[in-house]
Curated annotation (Swiss-Prot):
Keywords: Cytoplasm, Fatty acid biosynthesis, Fatty acid metabolism, Isomerase, Lipid biosynthesis, Lipid metabolism, Lyase. Its main location: cytoplasm. Belongs to the thioester dehydratase family. FabA subfamily. PANTHER family: 3-HYDROXYACYL-[ACYL-CARRIER-PROTEIN] DEHYDRATASE (PTHR30272), 3-HYDROXYDECANOYL-[ACYL-CARRIER-PROTEIN] DEHYDRATASE (PTHR30272:SF8). This is 3-hydroxydecanoyl-[acyl-carrier-protein] dehydratase. The active site is at 70. Pfam families: FabA (PF07977). Gene3D superfamilies: Hotdog Thioesterase. It catalyses: a (3R)-hydroxyacyl-[ACP] = a (2E)-enoyl-[ACP] + H2O; (3R)-hydroxydecanoyl-[ACP] = (2E)-decenoyl-[ACP] + H2O; (2E)-decenoyl-[ACP] = (3Z)-decenoyl-[ACP]. It comes from Stenotrophomonas maltophilia (strain K279a). It is found in: Cytoplasm. One of its GO terms (molecular function) is (3R)-hydroxyacyl-[acyl-carrier-protein] dehydratase activity. Homodimer.
Length: 171
């Protein structure tokens, strides 16, 4: 089977429903927690570590759900949502590789916020660079990531970790 190297919003939402890779595969969150509109490129051997990479985008609109509640009179995208998008994309990479299980964020080494996403912004871009993949009893990916708003880097994270688990009852 040939793997796709880009995904539109409908395909990403199909992943949330278990229709893209099957019901045993990891799923992306559904709206409103899906934090990107498209994956523009995903590769098994790309990125600076040569272990894989994902590139994705989110169109910014003033009517996005989080601007109405965070904060009233001072709308800004919560930083944790950008960080969660990085975990979502790292987990999607594992599922795209064909690993089974439910995705869970396992932590990160370092996170830096040096800017913000305001309603007047146009585009958020994510760059995820996979640094390690373990595919044994434990299925896990580790990545370094950056988030840009209108081509300005505003978030970075090192050593993001996501695992896929076939049983989550004791997690």
């Amino acid at each position: 089977m040939t793997r796709l190297h880009a995904f539109n919003r409908e395909q990403l939402l199909a992943s949330a429903r278990g229709e893209l890779f099957g019901t045993a595969a990891g799923r992306l969150p559904n709206d409103p927690m899906l934090m990107f509109d498209r994956i523009t490129d995903i590769r098994e051997d790309g990125g600076p570590h040569g272990k894989g990479m994902v590139r994705a985008e989110l169109d910014i609109r003033p009517d996005l759900w989080f601007f109405g509640c965070h904060f009233i009179g001072d709308p800004v995208m919560p930083g944790c949502l950008g960080l969660d998008a990085m975990w979502q994309l790292t987990g999607f990479f594992l599922t795209w590789l064909g690993a089974p299980g439910k995705g869970r964020a396992l932590g990160c080494g370092e996170v830096k916020f040096t800017g913000q996403v305001l309603p007047e912004a146009k585009l958020v871009r994510y760059e995820i660079d996979i640094s390690r993949v373990i595919n044994r009893k434990l299925v896990m990916a580790q990545s370094d990531a950056r988030m840009y708003v209108d081509d300005r880097e505003i978030y970075s994270a090192r050593d993001l970790r996501v695992g896929l688990f076939t049983e989550t009852g004791s997690f």
